[in-house]
Amino acid sequence: MSTLPPTPAVPPLVQTVWWLTRPINLMESCRRRVGDQFSVRFLGFERPMVMLSDPEAIRALYMEHSHGLPPGRTLTLMPILGPRSVLLLEGSEHLARRRLMLPAFHGERMRSYEGIVRDAAERQIASWPLEQPLALHPYMQALTLDVILRAVFGVSDAERGRRLREQLPRLLGLSASAGLQLRVLLSRRLRQGDPLERLREVTLEIDRLLLGEIAERRAEGRFEEREDILSLLMGARFEDDGQMSDRELRDQLLTLLLAGHETTATALAWTFDLLLRHPATLARLTAEVDEGSQDEYLRAVIAESLRLRPVVPLAGRRLATELRTGEWTLPAGTDVTPAIWLTHTRADLYPEPYSFRPERFLEGAPTTYGWIPFGGGIRRCLGASFAEFEMRVVLQTVLRERELEAVGSRPERMARRNVTLSPQHGTRVRVKRRVARPAPAAQPLVA
């Protein structure tokens, strides 16, 4: 008798293509036919993966810290981020690096980035063509990349910064291809060829740039005199008084660089798409921004956008011990993940779950494991607070300076790009200049 929930009645190849091309449709279909818990089988993986959406089951999964990472994360991310990335380490190694990196994204240090984010947003907005259709997502990517380079990496060499701005989008474009991901899975199964050859070439160029920055910083010393995260990490020490090597610093830098700008850019693109499809919500938010006295509705808009358009669909674990979830007892070694979209669209948690209604977050806070756009437990996204903070600053700046209108009548469909769900057509908008309004005298955004 199987100890795992049922799986769709189609071969693993079909499930794999289905997941790579229409992930939301796959999850919704399984929920309708099977229920809250189901298994899926993907090419290249020996075992099925169990997806679940009940907050109590998610709490039980995330509260057990001994569970490991599912192999899918390593397969997808290690060729890009490197083996020492905090996203890929486990156990004490993961916790030690998390402790070193977390202070950079909280408290006074994070608030000090507000001017940098606002300046980057204003410069980016000034470059937008007026009165013609454009895809907003690439502009959001350029904006958030500028922020992460200036505020987090503190690249001091202008030429190096320019080349990183060229190479990182290339790396993202190559890694986002569903066709590439399918070839990776098939190559594991057939043991033929290296589908990542082009991606490795771009990664080597980025390595050269990052390692060059690290070498110069190490030669200069005086890490305590700078406020960027690279200097913070280079000066930090583990409990045994050891430090990160140059190669490990490279892995952490690339992790922060990619995870810290692509996900936020995508979340911003989704938020604008939703706002432009809901004029009353946009009008209320714009009025709040103009008044400048509070940001409660802005926070609610962001929370609702992240609920209805979660950027990362999965945040799983490999069980170290058995897990009891409802009628199923899942054995150790099972790969289990919350299906974040399914959790966020449960009618018992969110009445009218497919409606964009930010007011629900003014009526009360979501349950801890019923709103998980950043994952949960000891692997919750390090930069979650920074991402929400950056989104607030960017949304305020755009709404003060420009008017946007949607191009086309249909909302964007979700398309899978590596580990993210992005607007299929990049959030098509038309931009108009807004009557100049000075930024209101308000208290700084609370991080």
Regions inferred by a protein language model and the residue ranges of each:
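Cytochrome P450 fold signature focused on the C-terminal beta-domain
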Residues: G221-E227, R284-E296, L308-W328, T343, ...
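Cytochrome P450 catalytic-core helices
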Residues: T263-E288, S385-R400
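Conserved cytochrome P450 K-helix/beta-meander segment immediately N-terminal to the heme-binding cysteine loop
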Residues: P338-G364
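Cytochrome P450 heme-thiolate monooxygenase catalytic core
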Residues: M1-T7, L69-M78, E93, R109-T266
